[in-house]
Curated annotation (Swiss-Prot):
Quaternary structure, from the entry: F-type ATPases have 2 components, F(1) - the catalytic core - and F(0) - the membrane proton channel. F(1) has five subunits: alpha(3), beta(3), gamma(1), delta(1), epsilon(1). F(0) has three main subunits: a(1), b(2) and c(10-14). The alpha and beta chains form an alternating ring which encloses part of the gamma chain. F(1) is attached to F(0) by a central stalk formed by the gamma and epsilon chains, while a peripheral stalk is formed by the delta and b chains.
Membrane topology: Peripheral membrane protein
Keyword Transit peptide: no
Family according to the record: Belongs to the ATPase delta chain family.
Source species: Listeria welshimeri serovar 6b (strain ATCC 35897 / DSM 20650 / CCUG 15529 / CIP 8149 / NCTC 11857 / SLCC 5334 / V8)
Pfam families given in the database record: OSCP (PF00213)
Gene3D superfamilies: N-terminal domain of the delta subunit of the F1F0-ATP synthase (1.10.520.20)
Gene name as annotated: atpH
Protein known as: ATP synthase subunit delta
């Protein structure tokens, strides 16, 4: 685990604990998702927030103006990050926090690769099968188009890969013929 991820993980876990204590897990989850999207969309704001020439107070004032509508506890957490010069971890903290929420809810993220876009019925069927396989209640599936698969699907859940693509089957046949 990288040092950055380790540091972000500690902050995310602390925030998650506070959210559980105050019954704000879902509120923080939504707001962190929106916050991360805003940070990704507005790189100039991120540069300002990370600018070393700005004082801590200036950064807090900037954050206060931009994040005025978020939960006060979450805003205080952002101030804490600014105080400790950890504001650049905010996006990673949001990811780790969301993973904790997903673990709590029994949800996993999955990337499904196919040659053509899958229908809702196909995605639901895949979700049902692989959620049971992973002992989860639900899968959040992201469907990606990959013409190189030739046919079939490849499902990636965390570090696990389930490859039922025609490309892999042809490669397996080729290996068997050469053996």
């Amino acid at each position: 685990m990288s040092k950055d991820l380790e540091v972000a993980g500690r902050y995310a876990n602390a925030l998650f604990q506070v959210a559980q204590d105050k019954d704000l897990v879902d509120v923080f989850s939504e707001e962190l998702t929106e916050l991360k999207a805003a940070l990704n969309a507005n790189k100039d704001f991120v540069k300002l927030l990370e600018n070393p020439t700005f004082t801590t107070e200036q950064k807090k004032n900037l954050a206060s103006a931009v994040f005025e509508k978020i939960n006060p506890t979450l805003r205080d957490f952002i101030y804490l990050l600014i105080d400790r010069n950890r504001e650049d971890y905010l996006s990673v903290i949001a990811d780790v926090y969301q993973k904790r929420v997903n673990d709590l809810r029994g949800v996993a993220d999955a990337d499904v690769y196919s040659v053509i876009p899958l229908s809702e019925q196909e995605l639901t069927a895949l979700s049902r099968v692989f959620a049971a396989k992973m002992n989860k209640t639900k899968l959040n599936i992201q469907n990606h188009i990959d013409k190189s698969l030739l046919g079939g699907v490849k499902v990636v859940i965390g570090t696990r890969i389930y490859d039922d693509s025609l490309k892999t089957k042809l490669k397996d046949m080729e290996r068997q013929i050469k053996a």
